[in-house]
C-alpha cells in the first residue's frame, strides 16, 4: 500500500510510491568493469518542498551476500510537473553529475528516465549517458539502469530489487538467489 504523508507537497503525490527507506540486492555487469552482485540502500525523503531528496549507497557483495567494499554513492533531487514529466538532478561519488528527464507512466507507478546532460571529472572514467527504469511492483521497488561510453553503446549495466527496510540477512538471501543479468537488462520487469 502506498502511503501519502500529510505534509507531502501536493505536486509530489504521484511520486509518493518512492518515499521511504529501501534495501535489497542487484547485479552489475558492464564491459571493462567487474561483474558483481551488489547490495543497495536507497532513501527517498521530503521536507515539504516540491522535490524528493534521493540518496543511494551500493556495495559489492561476496558469494554469501556479505559486504566486500563500497561500489557507488548517488545523491539527487526528483521533481514532477502537472503533466507527469519527471526531472532528476544527480551527483555520483565517481565524479559524474547528470540531469535526467522522463515521465511517470499512466495508470502505473513506473518512471522512465534518460540523461539530458552529463558533466564528469577527468578521474570519473568514460561515460556518455544513460537510461533508467524504476517500477513499483507488488510493494517492491525495482530498477534497471543502462549506460553508454564512447566505446560501448547504450546497454544494461545494473538492476536491483529493493524492499522497504529489510534486514542484512534478507539482503544476503536475495543476493544468493540473483539471476545473471539478461542481455536486455530487464531482469526484474518480466
From Swiss-Prot:
<comment type="similarity">
    <text>Belongs to the nitrobindin family.</text>
</comment>
<dbReference type="Pfam" id="PF08768">
    <property type="entry name" value="THAP4_heme-bd"/>
</dbReference>
<dbReference type="InterPro" id="IPR014878">
    <property type="entry name" value="THAP4-like_heme-bd"/>
</dbReference>
<feature type="short sequence motif" description="GXWXGXG">
    <location>
        <begin position="20"/>
        <end position="26"/>
    </location>
</feature>
<dbReference type="InterPro" id="IPR022939">
    <property type="entry name" value="Nb(III)_bact/plant"/>
</dbReference>
<dbReference type="InterPro" id="IPR045165">
    <property type="entry name" value="Nitrobindin"/>
</dbReference>
<dbReference type="InterPro" id="IPR012674">
    <property type="entry name" value="Calycin"/>
</dbReference>
<protein>
    <recommendedName>
        <fullName>Ferric nitrobindin-like protein</fullName>
    </recommendedName>
</protein>
Amino acid at each position: 500500500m502506498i502511503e501519502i504523508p500529510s505534509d507531502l507537497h501536493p505536486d509530489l503525490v504521484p511520486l509518493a510510491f518512492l518515499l521511504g527507506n529501501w534495501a535489497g540486492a542487484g547485479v552489475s555487469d558492464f564491459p571493462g568493469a567487474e561483474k558483481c552482485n551488489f547490495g543497495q540502500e536507497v532513501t527517498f525523503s521530503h521536507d515539504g518542498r516540491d522535490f524528493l531528496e534521493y540518496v543511494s549507497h551500493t556495495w559489492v557483495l561476496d558469494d554469501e551476500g556479505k559486504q566486500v567494499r563500497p561500489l557507488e554513492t548517488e545523491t539527487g533531487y526528483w521533481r514532477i510537473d502537472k503533466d507527469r514529466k519527471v526531472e532528476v538532478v544527480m551527483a555520483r561519488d565517481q565524479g559524474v553529475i547528470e540531469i535526467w528527464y522522463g515521465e511517470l507512466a499512466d495508470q502505473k507507478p513506473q518512471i522512465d528516465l534518460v540523461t539530458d546532460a552529463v558533466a564528469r571529472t577527468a578521474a570519473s572514467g568514460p561515460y556518455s549517458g544513460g537510461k533508467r527504469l524504476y517500477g513499483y511492483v507488488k510493494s517492491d521497488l525495482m530498477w534497471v539502469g543502462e549506460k553508454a561510453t564512447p566505446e560501448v553503446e547504450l546497454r544494461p549495466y545494473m538492476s536491483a530489487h529493493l524492499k522497504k527496510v529489510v534486514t542484512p540477512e534478507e539482503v544476503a538471501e536475495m543476493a544468493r538467489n540473483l539471476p545473471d543479468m539478461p542481455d536486455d537488462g530487464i531482469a526484474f520487469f518480466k
